[in-house]
């Protein structure tokens, strides 16, 4: 993170009044604050799990909702309970929101009884009750631009819109996910972009996160009502519930391919929380059953695929597994289109410029990363390479080395990140030998077997002296065996046994519409991935930006901890014990370095930077890598074992630290080693 000089900036703030806002943003959350973050207080008053937290706009009030069906409004700065009221719900409260521009007087709650209630805090009364949903209400969303309007997401698959100015006690359906995904789909979370209140993000069952343009949807419905043929429909002329261009989908590029494997292992993928960055340009998703992902909404990118420059300098120019030249990007977009008839190998374009040496301090970081790699400390190596990549984003060697570390660590999603790094390295240096070979291995591990074979053949053509190395031979045997296994499986299925992916189900319950398939195929990929936590047990687990400039990412975890990462490097910087069982909720204060958390314990915990004289060891998880490895095993464990673990039973191999030697990749790679350069 950038270095800070608070004395200098204080003087500048005194001299320049315009610098006050930038000062507040700069010192909202800093690296020293994160290092000193500790428990300040526990707010006691609930008698059940605390499932939701919400700050008011000024940050002097904090609302909480619980399994006890009560909501409490706190004065968090003085650790006082200001108000407690029974909400009228008959089941667990999952969401609580202050209505904007209402003087912190109106509070909205959604609960497992399928109801949405609106409360007037000044008189402690419920003034509106909506019962339109037919399943549990999981999230409420509000928008500053529309102070009388709010939205709800529920497990009936509906996104509903409410307008308190209308006398009707009913809401309207804004989005019906069952129209696209079948009756079994469940909406879990939603949020409105703070900078563009017409942009609504929705998380639901499955790996896809959806962005909708509310204004386009309303305009489309108005035009439909005004159309002379609005009431005349035939089977072939059914009106689309959403207009073209009103929805965009986002997904981690490797997840759609992994879905069959996850389903076989009863591993469920569901977006449990979505939120926008303060400037509205990024979308953060906590993917249940997987990791935390950040999507760039401005510079969107398609999921990565196999894109290699055709032309390369002679293999004689390759030294120590890399060239002494630095290639430029071939300018081809990274769309995930692995067609059955193969893939295009685009021509490399542009002048190949000399490889720029790393500055001495980055060379030291790279050397430290190489040493960590040699000691099989894969996560440490990845973090060091990531630190160097942030400072030298055009160095092909760093991407190639980090790819090797990802391939060795083999956490969920690591092979896809390695694929991305290999492609980046090749775009910077089209003759990066190791990146070419690792790319073939990544494609194989990601189940793109035919593409892996093509990639390996291309590698042998570019680097003929490596064609008969033991590494090439071993990978070739693996690919051949996988192809035979795949063909054998298809033959056993018999005619018609291998149904195409896009074959629509005849069952209304699980049918996916053609429009939905098109939107999924056009999905955008993530920019950053954050690993270490575990999100498999609850479907309300949050992840949030921390800091006015979104410098950090925070997330709860099934192990009772919450995790803090640097946003740009994705490096894990702190883990704190926040609950005896599970941390679900993390809500940062709007302007202070102040964090409210809650989970299974019936308390709200407040965290802020503590004095240097205070001992923080009681809540700090020192072995962050060990905790992360244990969570990776927990995510891949049998669901019954996870349930027993959460009940307090000790499962050998799950609750203990250490990576386990059985996960190590075969090290006999011959001449093309997976070690870093």
Swiss-Prot record:
<dbReference type="GO" id="GO:0016567">
    <property type="term" value="P:protein ubiquitination"/>
</dbReference>
<dbReference type="GO" id="GO:0004857">
    <property type="term" value="F:enzyme inhibitor activity"/>
</dbReference>
<keyword id="KW-0597">Phosphoprotein</keyword>
<feature type="region of interest" description="Disordered">
    <location>
        <begin position="655"/>
        <end position="677"/>
    </location>
</feature>
<dbReference type="GO" id="GO:0006006">
    <property type="term" value="P:glucose metabolic process"/>
</dbReference>
<dbReference type="GO" id="GO:0045717">
    <property type="term" value="P:negative regulation of fatty acid biosynthetic process"/>
</dbReference>
<feature type="repeat" description="TPR 2">
    <location>
        <begin position="397"/>
        <end position="432"/>
    </location>
</feature>
<feature type="repeat" description="WD 4">
    <location>
        <begin position="182"/>
        <end position="222"/>
    </location>
</feature>
<dbReference type="InterPro" id="IPR015943">
    <property type="entry name" value="WD40/YVTN_repeat-like_dom_sf"/>
</dbReference>
<comment type="pathway">
    <text>Protein modification; protein ubiquitination.</text>
</comment>
<feature type="repeat" description="WD 1">
    <location>
        <begin position="45"/>
        <end position="84"/>
    </location>
</feature>
<dbReference type="GO" id="GO:0080008">
    <property type="term" value="C:Cul4-RING E3 ubiquitin ligase complex"/>
</dbReference>
<feature type="modified residue" description="Phosphoserine">
    <location>
        <position position="353"/>
    </location>
</feature>
<dbReference type="GO" id="GO:0035264">
    <property type="term" value="P:multicellular organism growth"/>
</dbReference>
<feature type="repeat" description="WD 2">
    <location>
        <begin position="88"/>
        <end position="129"/>
    </location>
</feature>
<dbReference type="GO" id="GO:0055082">
    <property type="term" value="P:intracellular chemical homeostasis"/>
</dbReference>
<keyword id="KW-0853">WD repeat</keyword>
<dbReference type="GO" id="GO:0001701">
    <property type="term" value="P:in utero embryonic development"/>
</dbReference>
<feature type="repeat" description="WD 3">
    <location>
        <begin position="132"/>
        <end position="172"/>
    </location>
</feature>
<feature type="repeat" description="WD 5">
    <location>
        <begin position="265"/>
        <end position="305"/>
    </location>
</feature>
<feature type="repeat" description="WD 6">
    <location>
        <begin position="535"/>
        <end position="575"/>
    </location>
</feature>
<dbReference type="Pfam" id="PF00400">
    <property type="entry name" value="WD40"/>
</dbReference>
<comment type="function">
    <text>May function as a substrate receptor for CUL4-DDB1 E3 ubiquitin-protein ligase complex.</text>
</comment>
<protein>
    <recommendedName>
        <fullName>WD and tetratricopeptide repeats protein 1</fullName>
    </recommendedName>
</protein>
<keyword id="KW-0677">Repeat</keyword>
<dbReference type="GO" id="GO:0008361">
    <property type="term" value="P:regulation of cell size"/>
</dbReference>
<dbReference type="InterPro" id="IPR011990">
    <property type="entry name" value="TPR-like_helical_dom_sf"/>
</dbReference>
<dbReference type="GO" id="GO:0005737">
    <property type="term" value="C:cytoplasm"/>
</dbReference>
<dbReference type="GO" id="GO:0005654">
    <property type="term" value="C:nucleoplasm"/>
</dbReference>
<dbReference type="GO" id="GO:0000122">
    <property type="term" value="P:negative regulation of transcription by RNA polymerase II"/>
</dbReference>
<feature type="region of interest" description="Disordered">
    <location>
        <begin position="487"/>
        <end position="509"/>
    </location>
</feature>
<dbReference type="InterPro" id="IPR045151">
    <property type="entry name" value="DCAF8"/>
</dbReference>
<dbReference type="InterPro" id="IPR019734">
    <property type="entry name" value="TPR_rpt"/>
</dbReference>
<dbReference type="GO" id="GO:0005829">
    <property type="term" value="C:cytosol"/>
</dbReference>
<feature type="repeat" description="TPR 1">
    <location>
        <begin position="362"/>
        <end position="395"/>
    </location>
</feature>
<feature type="repeat" description="WD 7">
    <location>
        <begin position="578"/>
        <end position="617"/>
    </location>
</feature>
<dbReference type="InterPro" id="IPR001680">
    <property type="entry name" value="WD40_rpt"/>
</dbReference>
<dbReference type="GO" id="GO:0042393">
    <property type="term" value="F:histone binding"/>
</dbReference>
<keyword id="KW-0833">Ubl conjugation pathway</keyword>
<keyword id="KW-0802">TPR repeat</keyword>
<feature type="modified residue" description="Phosphoserine">
    <location>
        <position position="511"/>
    </location>
</feature>
<dbReference type="GO" id="GO:0042826">
    <property type="term" value="F:histone deacetylase binding"/>
</dbReference>
């Amino acid at each position: 993170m950038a270095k800070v000089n608070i004395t200098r900036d204080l003087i500048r703030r005194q001299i320049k009044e315009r610098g006050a806002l930038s000062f507040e943003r700069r010192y909202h959350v800093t690296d020293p604050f994160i290092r000193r973050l500790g428990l300040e207080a526990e707010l006691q008053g609930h008698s059940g799990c605390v499932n939701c937290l919400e700050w008011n706009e000024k940050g002097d009030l904090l609302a909480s909702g619980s399994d006890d069906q009560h909501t409490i409004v706190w004065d968090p700065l003085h650790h006082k309970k200001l108000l407690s009221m029974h909400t009228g719900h008959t089941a667990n409260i999952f969401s609580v929101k202050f209505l904007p521009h209402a003087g912190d007087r109106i509070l909205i709650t959604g609960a497992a009884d399928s109801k949405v209630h609106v409360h007037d805090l000044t008189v402690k009364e419920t003034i509106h009750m909506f019962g339109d949903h037919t399943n549990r209400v999981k999230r409420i969303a509000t928008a500053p631009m529309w102070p009388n309007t709010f939205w709800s997401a529920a497990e009936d698959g509906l996104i509903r819109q409410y307008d308190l100015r209308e006398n009707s006690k009913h809401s309207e359906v804004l989005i019906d996910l069952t129209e696209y995904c079948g009756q079994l789909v469940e909406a879990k979370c939603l949020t409105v972009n703070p900078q563009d209140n017409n942009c609504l993000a929705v998380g639901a069952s499955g790996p896809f996160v959806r962005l909708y343009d509310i204004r386009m949807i309303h305009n489309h419905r108005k035009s439909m009502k005004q159309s002379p043929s609005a009431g005349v429909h035939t089977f072939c002329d059914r009106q689309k519930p959403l207009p073209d261009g009103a929805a965009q989908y986002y997904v981690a590029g490797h997840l759609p391919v992994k879905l069959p494997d996850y389903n076989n292992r009863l591993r469920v993928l569901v977006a449990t929380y979505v939120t926008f960055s303060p400037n509205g340009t990024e979308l953060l998703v906590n993917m249940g059953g997987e990791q935390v992902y950040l999507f760039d909404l401005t510079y969107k990118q398609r999921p990565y695929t196999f894109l290699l420059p055709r032309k390369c300098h002679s293999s004689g120019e390759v030294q120590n597994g890399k060239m002494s030249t630095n290639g430029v990007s071939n300018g081809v977009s990274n769309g995930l289109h692995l067609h059955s008839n193969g893939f295009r190998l685009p021509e490399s374009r542009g002048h190949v410029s000399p490889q720029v040496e790393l500055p001495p301090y980055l060379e030291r970081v790279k050397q430290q990363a190489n040493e960590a790699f040699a000691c099989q400390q894969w996560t440490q190596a990845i973090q060091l390479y990531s630190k160097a990549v942030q400072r030298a984003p055009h160095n092909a060697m760093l991407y190639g080395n980090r790819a090797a570390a990802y391939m060795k660590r083999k956490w969920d999603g690591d092979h896809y990140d390695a694929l991305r790094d290999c492609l980046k390295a090749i775009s910077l240096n089209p003759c990066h030998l190791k990146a070419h070979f690792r790319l073939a291995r990544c494609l194989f591990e990601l189940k793109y077997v035919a593409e892996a074979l093509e990639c390996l053949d291309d590698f042998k053509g570019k680097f003929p002296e490596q064609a008969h190395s033991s590494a090439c031979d071993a990978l070739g045997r693996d690919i051949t065996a996988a192809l035979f296994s795949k063909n054998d499986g298809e033959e056993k299925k018999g005619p018609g046994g291998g149904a195409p992916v896009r074959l629509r189900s005849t069952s209304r319950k699980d049918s996916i519409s053609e429009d939905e398939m098109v939107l999924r195929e056009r999905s955008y990929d993530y920019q950053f991935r954050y690993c270490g936590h575990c999100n498999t047990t609850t479907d309300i687990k949050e992840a949030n930006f921390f800091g006015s400039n979104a410098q950090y990412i925070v997330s709860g975890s099934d192990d009772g901890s919450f995790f803090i990462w640097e946003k740009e490097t994705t490096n894990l910087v702190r883990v704190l014990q926040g609950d005896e069982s599970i941390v679900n909720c993390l809500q940062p204060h709007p302007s202070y370095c102040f964090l409210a958390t809650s989970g299974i314990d019936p308390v709200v915990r407040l965290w802020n930077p503590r004095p240097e004289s205070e001992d923080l060891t009681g809540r700090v998880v020192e072995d962050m890598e060990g905790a992360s490895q244990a969570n990776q095993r927990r995510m891949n464990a049998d669901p019954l074992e996870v349930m027993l673990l959460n009940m307090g039973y000790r499962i050998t191999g799950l609750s203990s630290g250490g990576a386990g030697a059985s996960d190590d990749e075969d090290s006999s790679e011959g001449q093309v080693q997976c070690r870093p350069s």
